[in-house]
A protein has these predicted regions:
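Short coil/turn segments at secondary-structure junctions
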Residues: 2, 48-49, 107
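Short, low-complexity N-terminal intrinsically disordered segments enriched in polar/charged residues
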Residues: 1-36, 183-186
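A beta-strand edge to alpha-helix "cap/lid" segment located at domain peripheries
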Residues: 70-186
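Charge-dense, low-complexity intrinsically disordered segments
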Residues: 5, 51-55, 110
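Generic signal for short, ordered secondary-structure residues
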Residues: 8-9, 40, 62, 102
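A solvent-exposed, acidic/Ser-Thr-rich amphipathic alpha-helical stretch
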Residues: 29, 33-97
Length: 186
């Protein structure tokens, strides 16, 4: 049995919103993508690549995200997604593969700590839409690479022209002016 198309698309949007919000440093928005009773299970690299640390609820997710504050910039590239219905209506499972870059600057040297990882997810449909109810992050491999140059992150923590809010999975309308038209022209 497979997940309904509309549910699969909504859950996939949730996964990508998470990656985008983390990369844009919008950690309060990340928290809202989880249920109030969610469990986030994380590894403790390099000691353990398996999920051994547990964070519970919104406060736990917020604490986990605070650890990224010391990282200059991140980029989460979702490279694989598998979704399946759970054992009840409004419950779904996901296995997400990702390459996560963590760029840091120390002593004028830029380093990219790359995690090749997998998220094993549980999703719940809530009145606010689909949310992450459980996430276990497993690291499959870690690389460290020198980097020549790194674009500075935006100071306001927002993606340029992204038009998305993690709290709402709907794109926000952009105020644009088509070429050759004045704002008064319909």
């Amino acid at each position: 049995m497979s997940l309904r198309t509309s549910d699969r698309l909504a859950v996939a949007d949730l996964v990508h919103l998470y990656a985008s919000a983390v990369d844009d440093r919008r950690f309060d928005d990340v928290v809202e993508l989880f249920t109030a009773t969610a469990e986030l299970r994380l590894p403790d690299p390099p000691r353990s690549l398996e999920p051994v640390r547990r964070h519970h609820g919104h406060d736990g997710v917020r604490t986990a995200m605070a650890a990224l504050a010391s990282v200059t910039r991140t980029e989460h590239a979702i490279v694989g997604e598998m979704y399946a219905p759970g054992d009840s209506l409004g419950y779904a499972l996901g296995r997400i593969t990702c390459i996560a870059h963590h760029w840091t600057i120390a002593d004028d040297q830029i380093t990219d700590l790359v995690w090749h990882l997998r998220y094993d997810d549980e999703y719940l449909r809530t009145p606010a839409g689909w949310r992450i109810h459980g996430r276990a992050l497993t690291i499959n491999a870690i690389e460290t690479r020198p980097v020549r140059r790194l674009r500075a992150p935006k100071s306001d923590g927002r993606a340029a022209d992204a038009g998305l809010s993690a709290a709402s999975t709907e794109p926000q309308p952009r105020k644009t002016n088509p070429r050759g038209r004045s704002r008064e022209t319909p």
